[in-house]
Amino acid sequence: GYFPSVGAAWVISEEDFMKDQKFFDYLKLRASWGRLGNDHVAASDGFASITTGNSASGVFGNSTFPGYQNTTYFSYLKWELVDETNVGLNFSTFKNRLNVDLDYFYRLTKRAVISPRLPFSNDVLAGNYGKILNSGFDLSLNWNDNIGRDFKYNLGVNLSYLKNKVKDLGGLSSIKGGKTINMVGKEMNSYYGYKVVGVYQTLEECAEDPIAVANNLVPGDFKYEDVNGDNVIDGDDRQVLGSYIP
């Protein structure tokens, strides 16, 4: 594959117009863009062979005969592509005692491998259908100083923020996977289930709630959110509950 990259940096503190200022001891602005390829993709995941039929698919006269049909699917898996843009700022101040590094990143994964279910089947077929966005920043603060001649110390703080979002699923709005879901506009592999909104406290409360009555719930049982308001807790009431990303 072809994976180009480019980067540039500007040490602003060395410019003539910065010579008279007293705040920055060092100031640098940098930016880069690059494309990466992920080849950790199992080619066999892009192949599926589905057999349908049963032992009595055909009838001839008074006899039944087995009949099966085999359908083969190919998705022709390719490498995932990752386009990443980084913008950073480095500066030192207070006679180089305070050093600050700030980085912003925008990482877009194209041709991400996802595995939707095949039509009329429980089998899945991996393909380059997805587009995933990761963006955020990293901040590092370091203070270096000394007390007297013999005691030196360093204090550091690191902060990070990451936002993950599914941008595209090959035309699908979501792909469910048991307790997780990939949904356009949400975080990758979000937790998916029923939201607990309380606990039934008394028999009277249970008797007045049609959901509790229908499911023989008693005080101490969880109360789940009825998302569509139909007084029935079923699969239509499952929702995104959060993400494994802190």
Show the residue positions of the predicted features.
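Extracellular/periplasmic, surface-exposed regions of secreted and cell-surface proteins
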Residues: 1-193
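Flexible glycine-rich, low-complexity coil/linker segments exposed to the extracellular/periplasmic environment
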Residues: 54-70, 182-244
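Conserved C-terminal beta-signal and adjacent last beta-strands/turns
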Residues: 154, 245-246
